Amino acid sequence: MRIILLGAPGAGKGTQAKIIEQKYNIAHISTGDMIRETIKSGSALGQELKKVLDAGELVSDEFIIKIVKDRISKNDCNNGFLLDGVPRTIPQAQELDKLGVNIDYIVEVDVADNLLIERITGRRIHPASGRTYHTKFNPPKVADKDDVTGEPLITRTDDNEDTVKQRLSVYHAQTAKLIDFYRNFSSTNTKIPKYIKINGDQAVEKVSQDIFDQLNKR
């Protein structure tokens, strides 16, 4: 099973991706995670990527396809995989097709923009462990302190409201074209994937069940 998981920043893609990964025993390929690891390394490329993300822009197609191509060649992708954060543009989708990457499902987790802004700007993170909190939906016991260590929580530099709005604008402009691309997609070497739209403004468990119900139909 090969799935592309779509969803605006804050839609809960990462959470659903982990659940799908465990249920179907497929590899979760998150370009966001790979990019953050590169930034954390402090390399020249990492510094360049940080500037791009801080400005609310998208990472180049060339870089994204390069890291995805390398990742899907690993043995844990033999049973299938879930692409989280790619493709985001038509050129990326076309490059995946050229690589012979056949997609079975396009799953979009849909959430209204005002809710996404609230979700993202309220996020707080413990850098060392990756534990995530939210000022409204999942607050720490002590404000801005990690529950386990008591260490300070941080806000990602790209989680401010202006940057989030810019990211959402870019997402909607590009994803609409991407969905049309896959809906009209035809190739002698590739079957047309099934497009599934899921209401993401529900409890995590309900979103997961809606996804499973659709995936199990085929």
Curated annotation (Swiss-Prot):
InterPro entries xrefs: Adenyl_kin_sub (IPR006259), Adenylat/UMP-CMP_kin (IPR000850), Adenylate_kinase_lid-dom (IPR007862), P-loop_NTPase (IPR027417)
UniProt key word Kinase: yes
Gene Ontology biological process terms, A to Z: AMP salvage
Subcellular locations according to the entry: Cytoplasm
Binding site for ATP: G10, A11, G12, K13, G14, T15, R123, T132, Y133, Q202
UniProt pathway: Purine metabolism; AMP biosynthesis via salvage pathway; AMP from ADP: step 1/1
Gene3D superfamilies: P-loop containing nucleotide triphosphate hydrolases (3.40.50.300)
Catalytic activity: AMP + ATP = 2 ADP
EC number, UniProt record: 2.7.4.3
Superkingdom classification of source: Bacteria
CDD domains in the cross-refs: ADK
Keywords: ATP-binding, Cytoplasm, Kinase, Nucleotide biosynthesis, Nucleotide-binding, Transferase
Binding site for AMP: T31, R36, E57, L58, V59, Q92, R156, R167
Region: NMP, residue numbers: 30-59
Region of interest (LID), residue spans: 122-159
GO MF entries: adenylate kinase activity; ATP binding
Keyword Transmembrane helix: no
GO cellular component: cytoplasm
Summary of subunit composition and partner proteins: Monomer.
NCBIfam families referenced in this protein's UniProt entry, alphabetically: adk, PRK00279.1-1, PRK00279.1-2, PRK00279.1-3
Domain notes from UniProt: Consists of three domains, a large central CORE domain and two small peripheral domains, NMPbind and LID, which undergo movements during catalysis. The LID domain closes over the site of phosphoryl transfer upon ATP binding. Assembling and dissambling the active center during each catalytic cycle provides an effective means to prevent ATP hydrolysis.
Described function: Catalyzes the reversible transfer of the terminal phosphate group between ATP and AMP. Plays an important role in cellular energy homeostasis and in adenine nucleotide metabolism.
Family to which this protein belongs: Belongs to the adenylate kinase family.
Protein name (record): Adenylate kinase
Lineage, uppermost ranks: Bacteria, Pseudomonadati, Pseudomonadota, Gammaproteobacteria, Thiotrichales
